[in-house]
């Protein structure tokens, strides 16, 4: 997943103008590549990190960014799920077995709220994935980043409702891992050693949000939200 995400970011930076015209195809390809190479470790980073970078390179209005988030996410999802379905179809034809029923049972298991006969809660899933960052160093760094951002934003008179709403699409992307954990509770609870890395989307999105907030003097007040 890391290599797919990194390659996607490099392609995005080198061919920004082309991807702006065919963003749906770019994220569709990322979803397909993730489905082919990944073993269900932390696939969401191949959507979240490039999407944040794409939003950073865009100069569109917040409403347009929300639309871009929706279309790019749907494109990635179609590529990811569609390629999985294609593998099941080819496997069923070659092996002369109904792999779709096996895939369906696997999906039900991985999205269930139980493991080894015990009920899994959403909070327990979050706790497992957040414990990797339960270090004093991480907490101090985030607290310092937050305080420095607030001080700079106040000093530059950037901490306004308009500016906060202007960069709110990044906050939407930051919520993606938590939605993923909700729909894959069994998998995220058991394999938190992999899935906790999807929180890098949240950290990157919030970091970009704070930096943009401090550097938001270029935003015109008449920009539509």
Protein language model regions, located:
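Juxtamembrane "helix-exit" motif on the non-cytosolic side of transmembrane helices
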Residues: 85-93, 154-158, 179-191
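Membrane-interface junctions at the ends of membrane-embedded or membrane-associated helices
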Residues: 13-22, 55-67, 155-161, 210-225
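Membrane-embedded alpha-helical segments of multi-pass membrane proteins
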Residues: 1-7, 25, 40-47, 197-206
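Membrane-interface helix-loop-helix junctions at transmembrane boundaries of multi-pass membrane enzymes
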Residues: 150-174
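Hydrophobic/aromatic-rich transmembrane helices and adjacent perimembrane loops
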Residues: 190-214
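Membrane-lumen/periplasm interface segments of specific transmembrane helices
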Residues: 69-149
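Membrane-interface alpha helices of multi-pass inner-membrane proteins
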Residues: 24-45, 50, 69-82
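Specific aromatic-rich, kink-prone transmembrane helix
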Residues: 2-17, 27-31, 49-57
């Amino acid at each position: 997943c890391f290599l797919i995400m990194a390659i996607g970011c490099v392609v995005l930076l080198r061919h920004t103008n082309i991807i702006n015209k065919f963003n749906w195809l770019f994220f569709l390809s990322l979803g397909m590549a993730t489905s082919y190479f990944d073993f269900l470790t932390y696939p969401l980073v191949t959507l979240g990190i490039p999407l944040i970078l794409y939003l950073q390179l865009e100069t569109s209005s917040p409403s347009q960014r929300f639309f871009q988030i929706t279309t790019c996410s749907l494109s990635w999802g179609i590529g990811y799920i569609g390629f999985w379905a294609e593998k099941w179809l080819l496997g069923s034809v070659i092996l002369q077995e109904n792999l779709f029923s096996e895939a369906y049972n696997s999906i039900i298991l991985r999205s269930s709220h139980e493991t080894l006969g015990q009920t899994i809660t959403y909070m327990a899933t979050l706790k497992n994935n957040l414990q990797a960052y339960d270090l004093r160093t991480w907490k101090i760094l985030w607290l310092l980043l937050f305080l420095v951002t607030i001080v700079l934003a106040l000093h530059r008179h950037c901490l306004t409702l308009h500016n906060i709403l202007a960069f709110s699409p990044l906050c939407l992307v930051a919520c993606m891992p938590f939605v993923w954990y909700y729909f894959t509770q069994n998998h995220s609870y058991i394999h938190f050693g992999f899935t906790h890395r999807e929180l890098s989307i949240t950290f990157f999105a919030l970091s970009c949000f704070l930096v943009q907030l401090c550097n938001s003097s270029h935003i015109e007040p008449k920009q539509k939200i």
